[in-house]
Amino acid sequence: PTISTLKELKKSGYKTESIKDELKRNLTQVLKAGKKTFEKIHGYENSVIPQLERAILAGHNINFLGLRGQAKTRLARQMVNLLDEWIPVIKGSEINDDPISPISSKGKEIIKNLGDKTEIDWIHRNERFYEKLATPDVSVADLIGDLDPIKAASLKLSYSDERVIHFGMIPRANRCIFVVNELPDLQARIQVSLFSILEEKEIQIRGFKLRIPLDIQFVFTANPEDYTNRGSIVTPLKDRIGSQILTHYPLSINIAKKITKQESNISPDDKKNILIPEVAKDLVEQINFIARSSEYVDAKSGISTRTVSYTHLR
């Protein structure tokens, strides 16, 4: 984009839009055009994908509930394709402030000082995807942020002042898609912090509350069986996740073979030298299907669809 100042942006007719409305608008256009919304996802055409489309149209935060290897994260990543290619942000903003309606004190200060001369940066949709694997050692500082005592002392500011906060991943993902994988593994107190962001539009750091209306599309993933024995989703947070979508393994061997063929990474030279009979491919996939119903395999942790190793055998 050639627009570089706030004045030019206003002249272009740009209007502020939430990320959920942006996703909804672009998804509606894709559906009207009869195009495929999620590419290279097999076996979900009549189950998971329609539910995901409805969740996006409803403006919900989403939780994918399923076992390992069921394309939960891949679906979340492909939601990026439903974002606008470029969005404007205030140059120098830490949390991707919208030039028309900034939410951070720094963004507001820049607009106040420079007015229409405020410089504009542009962010590509591929940069608007954040992902965090939830583990028990993830802290509030990692996700939400922490107070910077050195900054507070040097600027002579109170700890309750927004300017002394070093923002974590979630505030920096403002106007982006934020994925939390394995949500139940997050400590309960951090899940409560997420609840505050979803419900109250405020962040809490070391007892200080700060109201910042963050604009984020949250996507969570979780396993239906708590095979990690580490925790669960706290009820208040669960109630604020608008759509819970159950994923599943391929329902037929043909779909499983299609996934394996797509995911296997075989060089052109190897393809010339190696021939894998169809019956061998069927047998490998059949082993997966049998394992999922076998009493000798712990089905709670899932039998992944990632059976691509046989394609590399010599």
For every predicted segment, state its role.
Residues 1-252:
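Conserved ASCE/P-loop NTPase catalytic core
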Residues 49, 191, 238, 271, ...:
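Short functional linear motifs
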Residues 43-44, 300-307:
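Structural motif
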Residues 311-312:
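Conserved small/polar residues in nucleotide/adenosyl-binding loops
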